[in-house]
Curated annotation (Swiss-Prot):
One of its GO terms (cellular component) is nucleoplasm. Residues 154-213 bind DNA. InterPro entries: Antp_homeobox_Deformed_sf (IPR050609), HD (IPR001356), HD_metazoa (IPR020479), Homeobox_antennapedia (IPR017995), Homeobox_Antennapedia_CS (IPR001827), Homeobox_CS (IPR017970), Homeodomain-like_sf (IPR009057). CDD domains: homeodomain (cd00086). Residues 222-234 have a biased composition (Low complexity). One of its GO terms (biological process) is embryonic skeletal system morphogenesis. SUPFAM superfamilies: Homeodomain-like (SSF46689). Residues 31-128, 212-255 are annotated as: Disordered. The lineage of its organism: Eukaryota, Metazoa, Chordata, Craniata, Vertebrata. Its main location: nucleus. It comes from Saguinus labiatus (Red-chested mustached tamarin). It comes from the Eukaryota. Belongs to the Antp homeobox family. Deformed subfamily. It is found in: Nucleus. This is Homeobox protein Hox-D4.
Length: 255
């Protein structure tokens, strides 16, 4: 019986890769321990508690294991490596390295300091030059505001002419004592003065010139001539009435 069964079994061709369950049930791997599957001092299912938590259900050994099995085997197949990154570190026997910590978030104060101040100009740009204010751009008659001012035109301050301005005005007065509107505008732009200042200066200069040359004032002369003409016109009718009265008196005496 033994030989016949052996001959029958010898003709039977086993598959090249039989399932692991047949090896376990037949008792071919009875003397293998847990170290054979783990490859180290630690078990095959060892996982770091921090990264890969163990499942709640327990591991159950196969029910058909033959006598002589060293320890309970996992549900995975024969010689199968544990899946996942934890299995690689468990086989080598080294602890799993901790994952790299994320970079710290920047503080709001540091972010504000890193940004450039908008009030400060960039270092590459030059500072803005102040605007140039020419003398003719300035207002000559500037008076402080008086809150107690009731009305009327405020008193204007006296204009101080420079030597250059007086020299140019004297030259112009030497050639023309009276200026046209166009010429007055040209002189005002040239000397950085207003038209009113040019007009007043020429009026005062003409009065001084007449006083130096002892010439009568044209305004006083015209007023005196008008008064004399009015007096002569008022005396003429009275002289005409006197002869008429004398003739009338002689006529009455003759009667």
């Amino acid at each position: 019986m033994v030989m016949s069964s052996y001959m029958v079994n010898s003709k039977y061709v086993d598959p090249k890769f039989p399932p692991c369950e047949e090896y376990l049930q037949g008792g071919y791997l009875g003397e293998q321990g847990a170290e054979y599957y783990g490859g180290g001092t630690q078990g095959a299912d060892f996982q770091p508690p921090g990264l890969y938590p163990r499942p709640d259900f327990g591991e159950q050994p196969f029910g058909g294991g033959g006598p002589g099995t060293g320890s309970a085997l996992p549900t995975r197949g024969h010689g199968q490596e544990p899946s996942g990154p934890g299995g690689h570190y468990a086989a080598s026997g080294e602890p799993c390295p901790a994952p790299p910590a994320p970079p710290p978030a920047p503080l709001p104060g540091a972010r504000a300091c890193s940004q450039s101040d908008p009030k400060q100009p960039p270092p590459g740009t030059a500072l803005k030059q102040p605007a140039v204010v020419y003398p003719w751009m300035k207002k000559v008659h500037v008076n402080s505001v008086n809150p107690n001012y009731t009305g009327g035109e405020p008193k204007r301050s006296r204009t101080a002419y420079t030597r250059q301005q007086v020299l140019e005005l004297e030259k112009e007065f030497h050639f023309n004592r009276y200026l046209t509107r166009r010429r007055r505008i040209e002189i005002a732009h040239t000397l950085c003065l207003s038209e009113r200042q040019i007009k007043i200066w020429f009026q005062n200069r003409r009065m001084k010139w007449k006083k130096d040359h002892k010439l009568p004032n044209t305004k006083g002369r015209s007023s005196s001539s008008s008064s004399s003409s009015s007096c002569s016109s008022s005396t003429a009718p009275s002289q005409h009435l006197q002869p008429m009265a004398k003739d009338h008196h002689t006529d009455l005496t003759t009667l």
